Regions:
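Protein-protein interaction and targeting regions used for scaffolding, dimerization, and localization
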Residues: 1-18
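A structural boundary/capping signal
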Residues: 15-166
Length: 166
């Protein structure tokens, strides 16, 4: 496990140094995703993040409400870009804009009915997805429910076609 984490970290550092994302390509990608999956961040954020991670090797960024029980899944899953910004199915954001968004909500849409932000938002970087897989069984070992598998395959194909080969 330590070797796997070392390799993932080394690859991520190499990508950070060698590859800068073209933000216009990322905006084009998000436009396509939002048109095809308008509710991507209402339950499908982990599917988008896993597909993006599998194409780019970039780390996950888990958004956690520290007021909820520890065994609860993250309230949102994003990808950390080499420049420190975050990306999800809605677009490119900063940590500050994510915090502002969640604090502006009285109720967290798309999550548990009636759930409100209980505590402080925590950002947890997950380089290889091992933490994420503990929360989302359907993402463990690359397995999905049938509907998530179809969405995942389609989103993966879109990401590859827009960003090109890595």
């Amino acid at each position: 496990m330590k070797l796997r984490k070392f390799i993932a970290t080394t690859i991520r550092e190499f990508l950070n140094e060698q590859y800068q994302f073209d933000e216009s390509k990322l905006r084009k990608l998000i436009e396509i995703i939002k048109n095809k999956y308008p509710q991507i961040n209402s339950g499908g954020c982990a599917v988008f993040a896993k597909a993006f991670h599998n194409v780019t090797g970039l780390p996950y960024m888990l958004i956690i409400d520290d007021g909820l029980p520890e065994e609860d899944p993250p309230i949102h899953v994003m990808i950390k870009l080499p420049n420190g910004k975050l990306i999800d199915g809605e677009g490119i954001q900063t940590k500050g804009s994510v915090i502002k968004y969640y604090k502006s909500l009285d109720v967290l849409d798309g999550f548990q009915d009636g759930a409100s932000l209980e505590g402080k938002l925590l950002f947890l970087e997950d380089v290889d997805g091992s933490i994420l897989e503990n929360y989302y069984d359907e993402l463990g070992s690359g397995l999905f429910s049938t509907c998530h598998k179809d969405d995942y395959d389609d989103i993966l194909s879109i990401i590859k076609s827009v960003l090109g080969n890595f």
